[in-house]
Amino acid sequence: MEQQNNIPKHIVLFPDGNRRWAKEHGFPTLEGHRRGKENFEGFLSWCRARGVTVITVFGFSSENWNRPEEEVHYLMDLFEEYLGSVKDVEKFQREGIHVNIIGQKERLRPSLQKVIAHVEEQTKNNTQFYLNLAVSYGGKWDITQAVRKIVQEGIPAKEITEDTIAQRLSTAGLPDPDLIIRAGGEKRFSNFVLWQGAYAELYFCSKYWPDFGEQDLDDALVEYAKRQRRFGH
């Protein structure tokens, strides 16, 4: 694809459809998640090649804790494998990727918390590309924890602005999303980046995430480039 001028700086990704993909192909649910992880690694490279500088991916929601125990355990294994492998951490360093895990980290198992702390520390000075991986995350939770911080800091009500809240969200310091891509055919927000995504453009793809390819990203970018963003005006 030729480089476009109107490339979104920040893309939010809903990599939906792993379980449905597995079912339709006669695979176990866990295989769908494994294929989804592999596809995300490609997606990251495609975005970087096109000039995107921030990716926020919905890895595991607050509500996903209600899924079968085996599935939850496997997903935690995938996160730990992806964030904890020496090869991947070296790649993050080599390519200047700043990794930030957003969500209720205290709910994660200790070994995963340790891996997260390590990769965040190792990549904290990288500035070429930002990867936000949402694990045990919910948009309502994010706003709630920001409000709690404001209360704890004793900020008077009359001094609270939108910026006061935005600066205390888990994505503070990064630009708000420009484009939200959701694979898998669903057309809803699912309690993700509710505040940050207020003025983002939405793009829905009917393909399940493991089948989402480079051309599908380009289709989303072409559609984004055609739109006139109004930011509520």
Residue ranges: model-predicted function:
Residues 1-233:
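Flexible, compositionally biased loop and terminal segments
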